């Protein structure tokens, strides 16, 4: 049967249930146990043994085996599965007053996917299956759409993400991933709160962007008549709190960056930023080790983990090594020895490092060498320390190494997991760096930071020595759940709309008709479209964006296929 036929048949069952006086969409149900509790409580029950303990449970029917006077259902709730043992005489006797033909209605009007409540006693069948020996049942929710086939199930990865609710129903391991995510974030908060850190919420809508080099999402406030930005980091507002007298603050929340999508990047993601007065980046390294090892031990019960076939030992202390030393170790290039930019470029080209021609400083080339030749090799937890000042506009100058800053990034399985500074507290130095960033922004660098005058004013009131730390929650969850893609650990990741990309279009000037074909195969014809619109579409840098803004909903149309 097609999905449409199945849905039609189930709608008929909905009407039959209503005619029987049964509401197929119940208001509530009171359970006494979950499946896992019953499996644990009666684990020692022997085959053929019964107990008189009355239980009530609810869950989704995941399998049905129906015979003449007997039926076996597999019921699944959030914790696991248990079998329902359904015997005609027992059900008819128990439900005689409410439904004289209850057993047959159960057989005829329920389907895999329905949500059922059941009451009964406990028995273990002769085949050894712990079961609820059902006395009464209630259809709590009648499903209309069929679940994916057990063996050929939900294998389309994009569809799994797009219909996460179905993914969660049919793949218990996906539910486990999100349970662990919740345990990880709760564990991080608990660790910090036990050490007197205070979580304070900062604005998501901001009049200035800052705290990271990233392209923001832009929106508009109609009443205030001003552009606003979705935050790209929580850093600058948390630092204002340090200026204001708080000594230990953090925020775990969403940030937004209008950038690419990949297995490691989602435009909307979760991070935690932590700031501690009178601390430096060495203190932040200790804090990072403490947070991650404590959470891993609490959630997984071990510090020896496997990620995509790689064995990772999270046991502290973790390796600490400078970016210069790592680049020298993997490339042979000693960036301390280069006296000129051209010397650094020439040596780096010979070492096979791409992109050096565009680099304007030796520090930028050092970072390119690190990203190209080193990063992927850092499987075990490694603190990469002492970065070039050119790529770290918010970090304090290194106390003994000119041209460097006191910054570290934590790499695990070749992936940046945390970032930290001894924070820059000199307002004059900070202004100079932000003005340099603003100049890059004015020159067309969409990721460069602007000058946040209010933040600079705050610094001029005086910010104590401060250590700052950011941890990517999604990447940490990926690590601790052995998930290959960031989309596997975000419940509802951002996806391109189905069938929304323009494959090709044609314009007939005599009739002012614009015919558009989309990647889904759909073809639409738009009428009375001026030639100027077609010409603007031709020249638009993003044809999809132009279509949604100036064509869709603006002209009458007909769907051709």
Curated annotation (Swiss-Prot):
It is found in: Cytoplasm. GO terms for molecular function: ATP binding; lysine-tRNA ligase activity; magnesium ion binding; tRNA binding. Mg(2+) 1 binds at residues 409, 416. It catalyses: tRNA(Lys) + L-lysine + ATP = L-lysyl-tRNA(Lys) + AMP + diphosphate. SUPFAM superfamilies: Class II aaRS and biotin synthetases, Nucleic acid-binding proteins. The keyword Transport does not apply. Keywords: Aminoacyl-tRNA synthetase, ATP-binding, Cytoplasm, Ligase, Magnesium, Metal-binding, Nucleotide-binding, Protein biosynthesis. Its main location: cytoplasm. Disulfide bonds: none annotated. Its cofactor is Mg(2+). Its EC number is 6.1.1.6. One of its GO terms (biological process) is lysyl-tRNA aminoacylation. One of its GO terms (cellular component) is cytosol. Mg(2+) 2 binds at residue 416. Pfam families: KTSC, tRNA-synt_2, tRNA_anti-codon. It is an enzyme of class 6 (ligase). Homodimer. NCBIfam families: lysS_bact, PRK00484.1. This is Lysine--tRNA ligase. It comes from Trichormus variabilis (strain ATCC 29413 / PCC 7937) (Anabaena variabilis). The gene is lysS.
């Amino acid at each position: 049967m097609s999905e449409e036929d199945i849905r039609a048949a189930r709608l008929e069952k909905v009407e039959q249930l209503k005619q029987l006086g049964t509401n197929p969409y119940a208001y509530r149900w009171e359970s006494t146990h979950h499946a896992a509790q019953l499996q644990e409580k009666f684990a020692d029950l022997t085959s053929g043994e019964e107990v008189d303990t009355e239980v009530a449970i609810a869950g989704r029917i995941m399998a049905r085996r129906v015979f003449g006077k007997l039926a076996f259902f597999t019921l699944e709730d959030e914790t696991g599965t248990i079998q329902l043992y359904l015997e005609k005489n027992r059900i008819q006797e128990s439900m005689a007053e409410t439904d004289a033909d209850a057993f047959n209605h159960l057989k005829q009007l329920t389907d895999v996917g329905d949500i059922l409540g059941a009451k009964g006693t406990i028995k273990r069948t002769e085949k050894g299956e712990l079961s609820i020996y059902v006395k009464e049942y209630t259809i709590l929710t009648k499903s209309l759409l069929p679940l994916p086939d057990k063996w050929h199930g939900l294998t389309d990865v994009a569809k799994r993400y797009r219909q996460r609710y179905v993914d969660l129903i049919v793949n218990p391991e996906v539910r486990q991933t999100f349970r662990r995510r919740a345990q990880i974030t709760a564990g991080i908060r608990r660790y910090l709160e036990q050490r007197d850190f205070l979580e304070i919420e900062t604005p998501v809508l901001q009049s200035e962007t800052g705290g990271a080099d990233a392209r923001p999402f832009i929106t508009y406030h109609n009443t205030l008549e001003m552009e606003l930005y979705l935050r790209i980091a929580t850093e600058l507002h948390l630092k204002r709190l340090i200026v204001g007298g708080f000594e230990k603050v953090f925020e775990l929340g969403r940030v937004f960056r209008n950038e690419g999508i990949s297995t490691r990047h989602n435009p909307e993601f979760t991070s935690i930023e932590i700031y501690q007065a009178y601390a430096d980046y060495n203190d932040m390294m200790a804090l990072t080790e403490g947070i991650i090892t404590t959470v891993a031990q609490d959630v997984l019960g071990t510090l020896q983990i496997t990620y995509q076939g790689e064995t990772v030992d999270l046991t502290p202390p973790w390796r600490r090594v400078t970016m210069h030393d790592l680049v020298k170790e993997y490339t042979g290039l000693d960036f301390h020895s280069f006296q000129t930019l051209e010397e650094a470029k020439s040596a780096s080209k010979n070492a096979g490092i791409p992109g050096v021609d565009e680099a304007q400083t030796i520090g930028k080339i050092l970072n390119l060498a690190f990203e190209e030749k080193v990063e992927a090799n850092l499987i075990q937890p490694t603190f990469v320390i002492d970065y070039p000042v050119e790529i770290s506009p918010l970090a304090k100058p290194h106390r003994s190494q000119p041209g460097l800053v006191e910054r570290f990034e934590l790499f695990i399985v070749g992936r940046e997991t945390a970032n930290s500074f001894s924070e820059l507290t000199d307002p004059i130095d900070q202004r100079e760096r932000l003005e340099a960033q603003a100049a890059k922004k004015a020159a067309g660098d969409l990721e460069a930071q602007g000058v946040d005058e209010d933040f600079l004013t705050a610094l001029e009131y005086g910010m104590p020595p401060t250590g700052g730390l950011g941890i990517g929650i999604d990447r940490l969850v990926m690590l601790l759940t052995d998930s290959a893609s960031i989309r596997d650990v975000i419940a509802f990741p951002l996806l391109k709309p189905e069938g929304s990309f323009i494959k090709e279009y044609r314009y007939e000037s005599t009739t002012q008709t614009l015919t558009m074909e989309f990647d889904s195969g759909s073809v639409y014809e738009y009428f009375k479209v001026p030639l100027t619109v077609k010409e603007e579409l031709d020249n638009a840098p993003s044809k999809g964006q132009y279509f949604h803004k100036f064509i869709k909903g603006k002209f009458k149309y007909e769907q051709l296929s």
